[in-house]
């Protein structure tokens, strides 16, 4: 009887190890990656992970931000409340598609400063695209009332983008990444829909 119990216990341990292994495998398989992968069927994504950093000094430059390890993970739908700090948002992207032109957009318009920073590997320097509620539409990277930025990622390469936000109002919003053609097609459809309703 003792050997029978020992045999059952041994089999039970093996089954338990097997179940735990399957559970861990499934967890890793569906884990939320912090890198947004852009593939050929990609048109837009509004559900991915970002990282953010609160700069209470309001004086950090892009070099210091890029080298910082103080970022906290968050979904791209964020609500950080009223702060006097500058908020830096980090978005990691990997381009596995045949496209190279993409657009990053914030759905909230009331940021005094909403600048996008990225490292241009061909010129070996940081570039800044300025935007914000007080930036005239004619001076924006994309002439739209949205806070939107046009950027390129070469095929089969990765890029980290930093968005610098400064506001007098609460920090909240949603960051989305679009393929360039989808962004402009949906924008035209929205404008046309408005005029159809007018006449």
Give the ranges of each region predicted by the language model.
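Selective detector of the "anchor" transmembrane alpha-helix that sits immediately C-terminal
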Residues: 191-199
